[in-house]
């Protein structure tokens, strides 16, 4: 009887260890894929943005990461569709930021 309990404990421990290793591998794979996508995104941004525009987008990313991500996704879509023919400068990026910000910003009004 005690041997059966010990055997069950060992099986359970092995099963838990196996499950933990599988989860860890899945997390590592997800992190690796995310890093690859981020590297590809950065390469595209270097190609389609001027240095000043990249710097501005970096500052926006510090303050409003969700807005910066939306802008990056829009720029990648435009680039893949062939609609970006020349590098986007700082002035054009400001306009794009303003347009996307206007679409996503919500006004909160407090009535007294």
Curated annotation (Swiss-Prot):
PANTHER family registered for this protein in UniProt: PROGRAMMED CELL DEATH PROTEIN 5
Similarity field: Belongs to the PDCD5 family.
Pfam families in UniProt: dsDNA_bind
UniProt-recorded name of the protein: DNA-binding protein TON_1102
Keyword Chloroplast applies: no
Entry's Gene Ontology cellular component terms: cytosol
HAMAP family linked to this entry: dsDNA_bind
Keyword set includes 4Fe-4S: no
Keywords for this protein: DNA-binding
MF-aspect GO terms: DNA binding
NCBIfam families named in the record: PRK04239.1
InterPro entries documented for this protein: DNA_bind_arc (IPR022889), PDCD5-like (IPR002836), PDCD5-like_sf (IPR036883)
